[in-house]
Amino acid sequence: MVVVSLKEAVGLGAIWKFPWLAGSNGGAVFVIPYVILSLTLGFVFLTAEITLGYMGRGSIVTTMRKLGGSKWVPAGYLGVVTGLLVLSFYSVIGGWTIAYLVDAILGRGLVTSQAELGARFGALSGDPLLAVGYQALFLTLTAGVVALKVSKGIERLSRILMPALFILMLILIVRGLTLPGASEGLSYLFAWKPEAFTWQSLYQALGFTFFSLCVGCGCMMTYGSYLPQGSRILKSCAQIVGLTTAASILGALMVMPAVFAFHLDPAAGPGLTFVTMPVIFAQLPFGGLFAVAFFACLTFAALTSSVSMLELDTAFLVDEFHVSRTTGAIISTLVIMVIGFFCALSFGPLADTKFLGKNVFDWCDFLTSNISLPIGDLIVALLAGLVVWPKFREALSVPPAPSDQWFRIFRLLLVVACPILVVIVLVTGLL
C-alpha cells in the first residue's frame, strides 16, 4: 500500500495541479488551508474509503451493494462516472508529459526565452493532432497495463522510479531556491495575507484534497479491496496522507520560486509547470539529461496514477457484467477517449467554446474535484459511520488497536465534523 501511496503522491497532482492551483488562488491562502484539510479531513475520508473497500472485497458498486444494500448502489455508479471524467481530463496532461519527454530526448528540453516558453506550450496544447494524439497514446499505454495485468511489474518499477522522481524534485528545488528573486516565490506560498483569503481559495483547497488523495470516486476503495487480511490500514493511511501532502508542497517549491525569479505569471493556469520547468533545466549543468530523466519519471508517475483510475472502471465492468479484464479496459478506455477528445481540444479549437466561463476541460475538472468527489466522500462517511460502524471499527482494530476514546473522536469527525465542513465549503464555494 505504501508503494501505491508513493506513486499517487509523487505524480501529476503534486507536480502539475498543486502549483497551478496555488498560483491561481493566492498562494498561502490556498496552501495553508490545504495542508490542514489534508491532514485532518483527508485522513478521515481516506481511512473510511480504504476500509470499506477492505470490507467489501470488490468494486465500488459491489462494495456499496454488499455493505449497504441496493439503495446505496447509485452512489457506486456516481463513483464510476467520476472516475471516467477524471481520467478524461487527466489523460490530456498525461499526453503533455509524453510530448515534453519526446522534446527532451530530441534536445529541445531547455528554454530560456519567455516568448519561446509560451509558444512551445501553445504549439502543443493548441494543435489538435498533437494534443489528441499524445492523449490517445497515454490512454493506450494505460489500457495495456490494466488489460495485460502487468500492474505488479509497474509497482516493482515504481520502487525505483518514484524515489528517483522525488530526488530529482529535491535537486530542482535547491536550484530554484538559489535563483535571484526566488524568495518572492517562498513568500507567496507561505506568507499568510488575510486580505487575500476568499471562500473560493478554501473551496479549491478542499477540492484538491480529494483529488490528490484519489478519494470520493472509489479508486482507493478498489485498492482497499486488494489488501490482505490483517492489514494495518490506519498506518497505511497516515503514510499516504503524509506523503501526498509533502509531495504537493515540494511540487510548489519546485515551480513557484522559478516563476517569480523569471517573472512568469503564477496564475498562468494548467500549463504553469510545463512553461516553468524548461527554464530551471537550462540553469543546471547537464540540464538536457535532467530534463529527460524528469519527464521520463513524471510520465511514469502519470501512467501509474491513470492505471489506478482505469482499474476502478474496469473492476466495475468485470464485477457487474462479467466481462474479461481486457474487454473491460477497452470499453472504459473508448468511453474516456470520446470525452477526453473534447477535453484535449479545450486548449485549441474549443478554447473559446465555454458555458458559464468554463470549457470542457474546466467543467470535467470542476464537476469532479469540487462536486462529485466531495459528495462521494459524504456518502462514504455516512455508510462507514452509521450503517456498518461495528464492522468498520473491527476492521481497524488490528493490533496495536486504537483506544475507545480514539474511535469515539474518529467517528465524531467522520459523521459530524467533516461532513458539516464539506457542506459549508461546498455551498459557499458554489454561491
Locations of regions flagged by a protein language model:
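Membrane-interface "cap" regions at the ends of multi-pass membrane proteins
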Residues: 1-16, 43-67, 73-77, 228-232, ...
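Inter-helical loop and helix-membrane interface segments of multi-pass membrane transporters/permeases
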Residues: 20-25, 58-78, 91-151, 180-203, ...
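Select transmembrane alpha-helical segments in multipass membrane proteins
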Residues: 1-5, 29-33, 71-84, 133-136, ...
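Helix-loop-helix connectors at the membrane interface of multi-pass transporters/channels
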Residues: 62, 94-126, 226-230, 235, ...
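Membrane-embedded translocation segments of transport machinery
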Residues: 155, 159-303, 327-328
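Transmembrane helix-boundary motif of multi-pass solute transporters/channels
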Residues: 1-37, 218-224, 234-238, 242-245, ...
